[in-house]
Amino acid sequence: MQQAFRHISRILLGLLTTACFDTLSILPAAAQSCSDDEYYYPYAEREERRPLLTSDTTLFYRAVQGAEDLYGRYTDFALPPVALRRRGLDYTSERNTLSGIGLSYRYFTLLRLLGAEESRFSGLQSGPGMLPGPGGGTLFRFPDGEPLQPYLVSVRFADRNYCFGTRVSGTVRLPGGWRLAAGADFRTGRDLHVEGVFTNAVTAGFRLSRTFDGGDALSLLCIVPVSMQGMRLSTSEEAFALTGDRLYNPAWGFQSGRVRNSRVRREMLPLTVAAWETPLAPSTALHLTLGATAGKNRYSSLGWYDARTPMPDNYRYLPSHTGDRATETAWLSDDPHYTQIDWDELIRQNRMAGGHAVYALEDRVERCWDATLRALFTTEVDRRLTLRYGAEVRLDDRRHYKEMRDLLGADHIVDIDQYLIDDDTYGTLLQNDLRHPDRTIRTGDRFGYDYTLTTRHAQAFFEADYRSDRFLGALWLSLGHSSVNRRGHYEKELFPGSQSYGPSRTLRFVPWTVRATAGWSFTPRHYASLTLLASSRTPEASDLFYQPLYNNRTVGDARAERIFAAEAAYRLTGPRVDFEATLFTVLTLDGMQTRRYYDDMSYVYCDLAVTGIGTWSCGVELAADIRLADRWELTLAASAGRYRYVRDPVVTVLSDVDNTPVDRGSRSRMGGCEVGGAPQLTAAGELSWFGRRGWGVHLSAGYAGRRFVEPMALRRTDRLAGQGGITPEAFAAFTCQERLPDAFTLDGSLFKTFWFSRSRLTVSLLLKNLLGDSDIPYNGYESLRVRRISSGDATYYTPHATRYMYLLPRTFYLTISYRF
């Protein structure tokens, strides 16, 4: 009976609708604007028979399955600005990409100005077609649509790193279907807290794109960052105490009454990315990308030739070493002739040296050429299974050399090894470039060393992404081949012929990655997943050579670093609360590092290699977004973990002048040390209020605890700790790791938005470190040097003081932006 009634109702409804349509079709349509189509009929769309829509149940679960990194988003600006190695991992574990091309942080601001959207991924997660790693990353992409307010102009004022900045951006339509987005970011001024620190930087770029009728898409991106920054150096606690200034910076001094910084970083590293996307079949598309970075990175520092170091905080100039009252009085009185670089004195000594410089300002130059070609195929087998596969090749070519910036009143120097002039054994082997001996170096000339490190990499990859209602399964496989070599452009007299000149032997590696993910959506709001990863990666090229400046000798036990990781995550999304919890563990094996230093035990300049480094990280990350009311929001995030060294690495020390062993195969007592610069306890919270008429307030608090200084493997060997630690106290000084104080900061911001018909104006004030606490160390670094103390016939050893850097006190950012 009910079915018959439904059929009769549908027939009557259909007849009534048809009659209405017939009547309306003969009425005049003065208010209806007809198109040029002679068959135009305003109700034709309503008469079409539409098939009954069938819902895709996988759509209900994809939102909760694809949520972003909540912990990272909530802690980026809420935690104290201390050294933060998330999960105890090195920054190289994090991958930031655009169309598969690796990105540096220096390009992020302009990408956002040009309209790029970014997705954050934590830990073992990654975006589509993005090479996974243990440290997560950021995926940038440009959306297809156009912004509602395509133009931006903003100005900002600050007291940290710079004083004034401005940003402009805009998007326009060009003839032929092209779209152009352009932007620029400018910063200038000195730091109002730390003397000698300044920034003069401009970054400009554009993106030109077009989508063709057949579905093809072409884009060209170019970003050019140019910057000059005065840097800040770490120093010992004694120097901070003597000056009474936690922001003491030993890198600057007065020259003719004006502040001059010896450590200035100058960069110009343009980025170009060209992308072509084309459909090959109804279910397959090709995304071809070519990216390149080319430019120079310069870092200046003072050089001294057969003279005393000009750095004022050198241990020999501190009262603890000199032991005289006059030095202590000079430091306590903040006499800049003692506490800072005395540029006028350096120039005076140069003018007394008969034309040859005793002191000079050098630039350490890195000329980069990094190019990547990537082909990504995407095949949608059906609505549940998507395959991504392809290959990429990369060339990373970096040339390093020194260039004379300022002779400080002198006329020239001779390109010889100044440190060997008084050496009884090697004093006759002084030439830095044997093929051009005794070259006279003047301002702008290249000298000292000149070499190129080249890494070639090729890999193929495959990714399968399967979603079936509640279940998500993903698999990533990649296999590659890498080769690394050095090419010397100078022939060092200490290491003649192929020992320093020409190509070194080529080191080859086979990096690979396997990652598997399984997830289950219990409801459209509850999701849990498990991810496993195993991989090996090529070491940094500079860590494969004992002395890359002028020696082709490679580290003997060079291996690819191995990584094993697991991650279990739970995610809840709801109308009031978003919550995420992640358990993680990461084991890294066969890491390696190389250093160059002066060995106080043997009185020889040495090359150090540390191999077989192993670390283990495990812990939990929690994050929640709670919408308390329509205008109130609370975000919370916390983490707890343990990041430590789990193996005793092998330490090899070679003499820098002849490669004779100083210490070979010694074990370092690193097992049990904590990873430095990685807080093992963090917590952050932010309360936000969004008022009427565009007002808003953010108040946030951050905590970072269980922090440790960066440990050095050398001082924990038998040669140093065993020989130098003749008492329990001395042994502990070499082997125990210092814990840094916990950090707590409070931040606040106030903003007001004025809305107009098609534009808006926003004024915001951000205050960092409201409590003004400047006694919080940013980080600490153990020294490689050892101090010898003689008392009668006995000689005692103690490590050099740890070097620190402290947080800035209360700082502000005032921003005025206009979108239209």
Annotate each language-model stretch with its function:
Residues 32-33, 703-723, 752-820:
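C-terminal beta-signal and adjacent terminal beta-strands/loops
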Residues 106-156, 165:
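A beta-strand signature from Gram-negative outer-membrane beta-barrel systems
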Residues 157-189, 193-232, 264-283, 478, ...:
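Transmembrane beta-barrel wall of Gram-negative outer-membrane proteins
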Residues 209, 217-275, 298-363, 426-442, ...:
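Acidic/polar loop-and-plug regions of large Gram-negative outer-membrane beta-barrel proteins
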Residues 235, 431-440, 483-484, 488-495, ...:
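Surface-exposed extracellular loop regions of Gram-negative outer-membrane beta-barrel proteins
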Residues 249-271, 275, 453, 504-513, ...:
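Outer-membrane beta-barrel signature, preferentially recognizing the C-terminal barrel domain
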Residues 360, 388-523, 650:
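Signature of Gram-negative outer-membrane beta-barrel scaffolds
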Residues 467-470, 585-587, 606-715, 817-819:
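Gram-negative outer-membrane beta-barrel transporters
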